[in-house]
C-alpha cells in the first residue's frame, strides 16, 4: 500500500465512494464532525444545499410518510418536496450497498454540503429489501404505481380528489354509450341526463327525430303498425334488427290511421263498422287503437324531452 504522501492527488476525492484509499480516524487531528469514531455518537444533522429549503429530513420522510402514515396524505398536486426526498432516498439506498460489501460506512459521505448518514442501517435495509409489484421500486411506491395505471381496487377506494374527477370521465362515457345502445334497442332516444353527459345521446335523438320526420305522418307504411310489435333500428345501422311482425295489411293500416287522425278514442259503432269494412275482428280494432294511443303518447314524450334538452333548437 502506498504512503500517505503519494495519496495526495486523491485527497480531494477522499470522501467519494469511487476513491480506493480510505483514511482512518486517528490519521488526522482535525477530523470533520461527520466522521465520529463511535456509531452511537453520530450527530443527526441534515445539511442540505440552499436551493432546497423545503425538503424534509430523509429519516422523517422515510418512516413517517412512506411507511406509517396512510395513503390519504399524498395528494397528486403538492409541492416538490416529495420528489426531492424520493431522489435522496434512492441515493441513500445506492450508498448503502457498498457498505454491505465490506466498505466502512464512516467514509461513505459525499461532500460537506450534502452528507448522507446511516443511523439505522438494519431498519433501512429491511425497508428497501422488499421490491414492489412493479419489480423496480420498493413496496412503498406501489400506491403511486397503482394510481398511475388505474388498478380497479385502487380506483374504487381512492381518496384522491384528482382521481375522483378523473374517473368520472370514463364512467360517464360508458354510461352514455350504454344508454344510447339501450335506447336504440328499445326504440327510445337517449335521456336528457345522457344528453348532458356526452354527445352520443344528442346524436341518437337527432337521428330518431329525422327518421320520424321522414315518415309522412306515419300513414302509408307498414312500420307504423301497433306499437308493441314495433322494433326500431335507431340511429346505429350496425345492429341486427328483428323482422317486424305486422298482422295488418297496408290498406288496413291506412284506414285505421285515418280514423285515428280524426278521433283518438273510437266508439263501439265506429269500431264495428271498421271491423266489417277491413275484415278484422272487433278485438283487433280495439287493441290497435290502444297500441296506437300508447305509441302517440311515447312519441310526444320523446319529442318534448328532445326539445327541452336542446334549448337552441
Curated annotation (Swiss-Prot):
Residues 207-217 have a biased composition (Basic and acidic residues). Residues 188-246 are annotated as: Disordered. SUPFAM superfamilies: Homeodomain-like. GO terms for biological process: anterior/posterior pattern specification; bone development; branching involved in ureteric bud morphogenesis; cartilage development involved in endochondral bone morphogenesis; cell development; chondrocyte development; chondrocyte differentiation; developmental growth. The keyword Metal-binding does not apply. It is found in: Nucleus. One of its GO terms (molecular function) is sequence-specific double-stranded DNA binding. Its main location: nucleus. Residues 241-300 bind DNA. InterPro entries: DUF3528, HD, HD_metazoa, Homeobox_CS, Homeodomain-like_sf. It comes from the Eukaryota. Keywords: Developmental protein, DNA-binding, Homeobox, Nucleus, Transcription, Transcription regulation. Sequence-specific transcription factor which is part of a developmental regulatory system that provides cells with specific positional identities on the anterior-posterior axis. This is Homeobox protein Hox-A11. It comes from Mus musculus.
Amino acid at each position: 500500500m502506498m504512503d500517505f504522501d503519494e495519496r495526495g492527488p486523491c485527497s480531494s476525492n477522499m470522501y467519494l465512494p469511487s476513491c480506493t484509499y480510505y483514511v482512518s480516524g486517528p490519521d488526522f487531528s482535525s477530523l470533520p464532525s461527520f466522521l465520529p469514531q463511535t456509531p452511537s455518537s453520530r450527530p443527526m444533522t441534515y445539511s442540505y444545499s440552499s436551493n432546497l429549503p423545503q425538503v424534509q429530513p430523509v429519516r422523517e420522510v422515510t418512516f413517517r410518510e412512506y411507511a406509517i402514515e396512510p395513503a390519504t396524505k399524498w395528494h397528486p398536486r403538492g409541492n416538490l418536496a416529495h420528489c426531492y426526498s424520493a431522489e435522496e432516498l434512492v441515493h441513500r439506498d445506492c450508498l448503502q450497498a457498498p457498505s454491505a460489501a465490506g466498505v466502512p460506512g464512516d467514509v461513505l459521505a459525499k461532500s460537506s454540503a450534502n452528507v448522507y448518514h446511516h443511523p439505522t442501517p438494519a431498519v433501512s435495509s429491511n425497508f428497501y429489501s422488499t421490491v414492489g409489484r412493479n419489480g423496480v421500486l420498493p413496496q412503498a411506491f406501489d400506491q403511486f404505481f397503482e394510481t398511475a395505471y388505474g388498478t380497479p381496487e385502487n380506483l374504487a377506494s381512492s381518496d384522491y380528489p384528482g382521481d375522483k374527477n378523473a374517473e368520472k370521465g370514463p364512467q360517464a362515457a360508458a354510461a352514455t354509450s350504454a344508454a344510447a345502445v339501450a335506447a336504440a334497442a328499445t326504440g327510445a332516444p337517449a335521456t336528457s341526463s345522457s344528453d348532458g353527459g356526452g354527445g352520443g345521446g344528442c346524436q341518437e335523438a337527432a337521428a330518431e327525430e329525422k327518421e320520424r320526420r321522414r315518415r309522412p305522418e306515419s300513414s302509408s307504411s307498414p312500420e307504423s303498425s301497433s306499437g308493441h310489435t314495433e322494433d326500431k333500428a335507431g340511429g346505429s345501422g350496425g345492429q341486427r334488427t328483428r323482422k317486424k311482425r305486422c298482422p295488418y295489411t297496408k290498406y288496413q293500416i291506412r284506414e285505421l290511421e285515418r280514423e285515428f287522425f280524426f278521433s283518438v278514442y273510437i266508439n263501439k259503432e265506429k269500431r264495428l263498422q271498421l271491423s266489417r269494412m277491413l275484415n278484422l275482428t272487433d278485438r283487433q280494432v280495439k287493441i290497435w287503437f290502444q297500441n296506437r294511443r300508447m305509441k302517440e303518447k311515447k312519441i310526444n314524450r320523446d319529442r318534448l324531452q328532445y326539445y327541452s334538452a336542446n334549448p337552441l333548437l
